[in-house]
Amino acid sequence: AAELKERLENMGADVDGIWAATFHSACVRILRQDIEELGMGYKSNFTIYDTDDQLKVIKTVMKEHNISDKAVTPKAVQNLISRSKDKLITPDKFSTKGKNGSDDYQLSTAKTIYTDYQARLEAANALDFDDIIMLTVKLFAHCPDVLSHWQNRFKYIMVDEYQDTNAAQYKLV
């Protein structure tokens, strides 16, 4: 992002009003200002959990639910939660149905972990990396005044390597 701004400046552009940011850094900035509008209990001073923090919470949840890491590994659950959030799937929308349409033990177990994991993040006023985009999408969808404010803030949005965006990033733009 800084490199892009530097290139624009070298071309003679006035970069004072330009946001050059990753999806995540732009969304953090938006959430720091407006997350309380969601009414979910998050405060603007939220903490962002890294991969190690996420795994620690997942392992705690698994231990408290007596879920063996032989049945499902914490890393696999973390990846499943991340992929779900990339598709804007919240714990209550998470499907436990396997490919054959019947309940799948591993997916049911993952849903239990995902639900408790997310509750713990909310209780700690914490977001994981995937929440940053998912909650910004939710903020814009549920708070039209906030959406309008940010739409009016930007005349143009340029996305580098747009073909690599996931569903949540696509919805955000």
For each feature predicted by the language model, list its residue ranges:
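Conserved strand-to-helix beginnings and helix N-cap segments that scaffold or border functional pockets
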Residues: K5, Q169-Y170
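A basic/glycine-biased coupling hinge at the interface between accessory DNA-binding modules
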Residues: A1-Y156
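SF2 helicase catalytic motif II
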Residues: W150-Q169
